[in-house]
Amino acid sequence: MTEAAAYRKGLDFARGLDARDPLSRFRDRFHIPPAAAGEPEIYLCGNSLGLQPKSAADYVTAELDKWRRLAVKGHFEGDYPWLPYHEFLAETMAELVGGAPGEVVTMNSLTANLHLMMVSFYRPTRARHKILIEDHAFPSDRYAVESQIRFHGYDPADSLVVVEPRDGEALIHDDDIADVIERHGQSLALIMLPGVQYYTGQVFDMAGITRLGHDRGCVVGFDLAHAAGNIPLDLHDWDVDFAVWCTYKYLNSGPGAVAGCFVHARHGSSAGLPRFSGWWGHDKASRFEMGARFDPMPGAEGWQLSNPPILSLAAIRASLDIFREAGGMAPLREKSLRLTGYLEWLLSEALGERISIITPREPNRRGCQISLRVTSDSYSGRDLFAHLAAAGVTGDWREPDVIRIAPVPLYNRFEDCHRFVEIFKDFDRNNAHT
């Protein structure tokens, strides 16, 4: 019997799944925003901003209190002194992305880190100057890539290679990525693709892409904004050169929080690798000697520029502690597959051809997110999205016509999926042409 065949309609079935869920207790560790009626929102937007851990306020308040009590001495005193504070996040963050010790650091923002990585890893020559990205890449990635191309004196019209879906399709075929790498391999300086595509929710074959790219002499990096904390990653063993990600989505660190960066160990101590430098990347044993010569720390820490914002790191630590307590990505991924499988089944049963799910139907090719388009002649996607918001469902709208729904395994329930689809069904029934 297939898993879909085991699903049943009705709220009792959803509640039964929740009752048997070993991760259900973690929902109470997060603040669920209230809806207008006083009930908790049906929050399905963790792919845009994760919910606040209830412990985050305590973690942040502890650092505010330390500042009040100790002032500058807080850099060196207390359970979590500020000077090495980023190090307290390193082990769990590395585990979540499959990094080895020293390969991961929490710093800056995603796009800032992408620029820092491209300073080191995009070294164009007349023969090899192209960068491969995907069609409909997240705009900030494309802006960064095109600006780097121009900075080096090249034209994106010549140096930007875009792999696209086939006509009439939303997803990009693995074979087409391989074909583009094969055709442009000798002129590609950098492959820069997402781990999970933000618009469609498609998981890319990062191991395969890295292998293909390296076989043709390309540097391979990934934007993991929608992958970190969402799907299992194994960056070190996949031999990825670098990766960047934000922490405010699935990692629940708060709006605009500090981002993450991975640099493979084989690059971490490369003396000849160019970089933009700052004092926080200097060898910590001699940093405060204030010497004139930059001596980088080994590993990803050597790309740090300035001392990080402690209050933001405190909020990240609160969330990472929950990930560790939950057992890391393996149990979360297991629940995520069941959540999205159940949600996909409910949508297909209830709406049929009146919607189009553009996220891959194969569970291993998607993360938490289901992206859908309304295909009904009776109402638009915007009409539906407005109704969902008014009914206490928080999803995510992406132009021109996609609604993204993301049940997150740390705090979403099967009941959330059921209630969302019931609200959708009622709207569909009430707005159908007769």
Language-model region placement:
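Pyridoxal 5′-phosphate
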Residues: M1-T434
